[in-house]
Amino acid sequence: MNKKLNTLLRYSELIVYKTYADLRAETERTYLGFLWWVFEPILYMSVFYVFFGLLLKQGTPDYVPFLLVGLTAWQWLKSCLSHGAETILGASGLMQHVFLPKVIFPIILVLTDTVKFLFILVLLFIFLWWYGYSVNITYLALPIVLLIQLLFTMALVFFLAAVVPFLPDLRFVVENILLALFFMSGVMIRSDIVPEAYQHYYYSNPIVILIESYRDILMYNV
């Protein structure tokens, strides 16, 4: 364990620089630059709100913030997993010429997506305050939930990134698994509509716990 930590510390500057370089390269590939980090999730969330909140009339008075909190947390996880699964496989060519620890590539990917997530999180705060949800003492628990999700996401990305080089076909399965998880993780529905007989299975999904924790902190002051 100490050896692995020392390795990470030794390459920490490279990790930070590569994260910055990837973010900068991404902004330079489009005219709007980093604004796409904001516009893309807003468009994504708008589609779900129009379809489920307006057309299907699934909403309640607080359905908009309810949906946005769930989608914000979900998108962070989904982005890291869908992009992170191929990080080691994609860097195999580079590692043949330069010795680099495999572990740094998933870390760089997760850090890159986390920076973009933080932009969206700030916008979510602004929206919630505008909508009438005030800052309260429960916000002190938010860093703990964020850290738990970061560690949970990192663990899943490490696993996928390590397995995909040996089972390349798995990368095509990941997106379908994420789609299934999306509908089973309480992003769009309230837990009270889940039948009592299935509540145990519903809450055995750790993503449900994370998303409900965000809502408890940001919306319900719990």
Model-derived regions, located:
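Hydrophobic transmembrane alpha-helices and immediately adjacent juxtamembrane helices
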Residues: 1-222
